[in-house]
Amino acid sequence: PAKARACIFIFLEGGPSQIDLFDPKPKLNALDGQPLPESLTKNVRFAFIKKESAVLLGSKRTFTRHGQCGMEFSDLVPHLAGCADDLLMIRSMHTDQFNHHPAQLVLHSGRPFFGLPTAGAWLTYGLGSESQSLPGYVVLSAGRGTSGGASLWQSGFLPSVHAGVLFRSQGEPVLNLTNPPGLPPELQRRGLDA
């Protein structure tokens, strides 16, 4: 059997909803515009939704099946749909967290609090890295960052070598690669050798 050597995890904070990209909801589309059912609102406090006036909103996108696997994609991602047979899609995840940051922590670490290794940290811990001189886990950012910040790529209680390295799209691509002005290289070497 094949053994995984790498993983590309795409997390699009602020991106389109999954129901407009990868997760068709025919029943939701059939109920579009109708009030929220009591089964969803009873004994639930919402931070930003007025239960009395809230209505269900289905997707306006068109979904079609792609590849031999028949994975469904919306018309918003035609190029990604062309890779359907090379992708793994997980549609069974859910959370009781309704605020973004705790929900993001659940997605990345399995729990809604700080200090735990993220999925990327566990992957580098388990799979290792093909290079000792390059990071095994990198994070790409569009520039504005995430509401979860570095807590979404931390190593938690695993050694820090398993934390994600942020690659920035603006300014210095990777922070702290050069010595501060005035720090002699031999002083840094002594610190590393200590």
Residue ranges of predicted features:
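Ligand-binding pockets and gating/stacking loops
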Residues: 1-194
